[in-house]
């Protein structure tokens, strides 16, 4: 059976769809293609369970110099290509389907459409949400495989394969010593409630370096905080480095998602706020200390790895001290 999975959300949601992709492909009865957006596509790039990966550019994800018309023409070509594929089934991989996904269904016109949410004439298999509440997003998305009677009854590990050439280049550029553990501090977060301040990251780095022979890799979203399209944390990274002049910290300015994935693949543990980077670490099998502000750990905790969630009662990560996070690090990552 030819199956198209449409997952057009962010990095974390896309990675949390990979157990469903794996279960369908590894059943031996289905060819699985995936449609996503250019922003999330790199996390699926080398996935062996995907026959064909299609992606389009959202208008607000256009690169500098990429015109709106060119973007729309590219999307039209993709629509025509998908229509020719003659899929048997389309799965809308979202906890509740939306109109954006349905637009692609109208183009593809499969025999069956599987989705979660409210009824629609185009949706042939409308599934109820999993009965367990609260439910992890990976379990919610995996429930979309119920009509296929898969042998797996629960989602397995996430799948993410780094680009080996990029990883090798970063290993050389950053002078990574393979005999010494590398721990990643990922300092960026989209939500203000999940943005742990620079001084606390510096304090954490001091504590880790004082107690463990290690290399510390500092990772962040590139760009200035004032960039209106893609705000980054260049200033925060510089502040942390200035506070830790004598520590074994390697500031790795990853300018693309494949670079971030490759950099994390060189590490043996991760401290990060909830978000796409946290799920990348989990998908690579790293033990994770996850800082949660105003989001629900029951739905979004790192999947199928050793992890510890820290969420203060205020739901503001800056209520956490560097000592609290270090204790979680020592318990979760170095033991």
Predicted feature locations:
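Catalytic machinery of carbohydrate-active enzymes
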Residues: 1-335
């Amino acid at each position: 059976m030819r199956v198209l999975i449409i997952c057009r959300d962010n990095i974390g949601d896309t990675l949390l769809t990979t157990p469903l992709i794996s279960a369908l492909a590894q059943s031996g009865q289905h060819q699985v293609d995936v449609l996503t957006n250019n922003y999330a596509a790199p996390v699926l790039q080398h996935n062996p369970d995907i026959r064909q990966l299609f992606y389009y550019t959202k208008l607000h994800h256009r690169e500098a110099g990429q015109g709106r018309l060119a973007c729309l023409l590219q999307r039209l070509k993709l629509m025509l290509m998908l229509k020719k594929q003659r899929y048997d089934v389309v799965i809308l991989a979202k906890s509740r389907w939306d109109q954006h996904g349905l637009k692609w269904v109208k183009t593809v016109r499969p025999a069956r459409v599987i989705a979660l949410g409210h009824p629609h004439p185009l949706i042939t298999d409308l599934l109820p949400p999993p009965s367990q509440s609260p439910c992890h997003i990976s379990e919610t998305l995996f429930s979309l495989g119920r009509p296929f009677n898969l042998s797996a009854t629960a989602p397995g590990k996430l799948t993410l394969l780094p680009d080996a050439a990029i990883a090798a280049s970063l290993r050389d550029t950053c002078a990574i010593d393979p005999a010494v553990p590398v721990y990643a501090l990922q300092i960026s977060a989209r939500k203000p409630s999940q943005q742990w301040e620079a001084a606390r990251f510096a304090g954490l780095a001091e504590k880790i370096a004082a107690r463990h022979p290690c290399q510390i890799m500092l990772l962040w979203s590139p760009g200035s905080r004032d960039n209106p399209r893609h705000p980054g944390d260049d200033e925060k990274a510089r502040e942390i480095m200035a506070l830790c002049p004598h520590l074994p910290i390697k500031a790795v300015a990853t300018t693309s998602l494949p670079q971030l994935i490759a950099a994390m693949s060189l590490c043996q543990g991760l401290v990060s706020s909830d978000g796409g980077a946290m799920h990348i670490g989990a998908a690579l099998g790293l033990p994770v200390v996850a800082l949660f502000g105003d989001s629900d750990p029951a739905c979004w905790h790192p999947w199928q790895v050793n992890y510890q969630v820290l969420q203060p009662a205020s739901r503001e990560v800056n209520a956490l001290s560097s000592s609290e996070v270090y204790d979680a690090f020592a318990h979760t990552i170095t033991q």
